[in-house]
A protein has these predicted regions:
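Transmembrane helix boundary and interhelical junction motifs in multipass membrane proteins
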Residues: 40-62, 129-139
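Hydrophobic alpha-helical transmembrane bundles that constitute the permease/transmembrane domains
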Residues: 81, 132-133, 156-164
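Residue-level signature of transmembrane alpha-helical cores of multipass secondary-active transporters
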Residues: 44, 123-127, 155
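Hydrophobic, membrane-inserted alpha-helices
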Residues: 20, 57-60, 162-169
Length: 203
């Protein structure tokens, strides 16, 4: 089972990279002035996918100064929905592994999942819109077999307004270029510290 999961994961990674390569080619041929937005979508996706500790907030703030905040928010929402579709599929495979099922069948997990199932859509929207960690709710969605369509819809409903607020804030405050670099480093340091703190706490 483990080897088959790895093979599927690599196929998903290839689909992920290929989709953005195709988008880059299409935009380059027909609307080259929006080429950097493809990279924005790519960055937004990997910060919710294979490199989750990458901060997306400074990038959304920056792009709010370069393009219409509504456009930035909409594309950010679409990119996040695309990557969450892939996340859902990967987690569906991982949670079928026997070692993982020993965790998801524990009493504490089933109790937490039960609370999630009382209001899954609202839970996903609130965690996606606010600083509340989204990852546990993503896992609950998969293990509780929550509708993929509703899951993706909740992601769009939650993330798009969040991106719009950030992009609009960026358009209003208009920091110097180095300001976004400092913000990026601050958010990155916080994310890495949190991950290390959790790892040491578990150890």
């Amino acid at each position: 089972m483990g080897s088959s999961v790895k093979k599927v994961k690599w196929w998903i990674y290839l689909i992920f990279i290929g989709s953005f390569a195709l988008a880059e080619l299409v935009v380059l041929l027909f609307s080259p002035q929006y080429q950097t937005l493809v990279w924005f979508c790519f960055y937004t996706s990997i910060s919710n996918f294979c490199i989750p500790w990458l901060p997306h907030e400074p990038m959304v703030l920056l792009y709010g100064t370069l393009f219409n905040p509504l456009l930035v928010a909409f594309l950010g929402g679409i990119a996040t929905c695309w990557v969450e579709f892939l996340n859902y599929k990967i987690l569906g495979l991982i949670t079928n592994i026997r070692q993982i099922q020993t965790i998801t069948k524990k009493q504490w997990y089933l109790k937490a999942e039960g609370w999630f199932k009382k209001a899954p859509f609202l839970s996903l929207v609130i965690s996606g819109l606010t600083p509340i960690p989204f990852a546990p709710f993503r896992v609950f969605s998969v293990t509780s077999r929550y509708s993929l369509t509703r899951y993706i819809l909740s992601v769009f409903v939650a993330r798009t307004p969040r991106y719009y607020i950030l992009a609009l804030t960026g358009a209003v405050i208009k920091l110097p270029w180095w300001g976004y670099g400092i913000l990026f480093l601050i958010f990155l340091a916080i994310a890495l510290y949190s991950r290390l703190h959790i790892r040491y706490a578990k150890g």
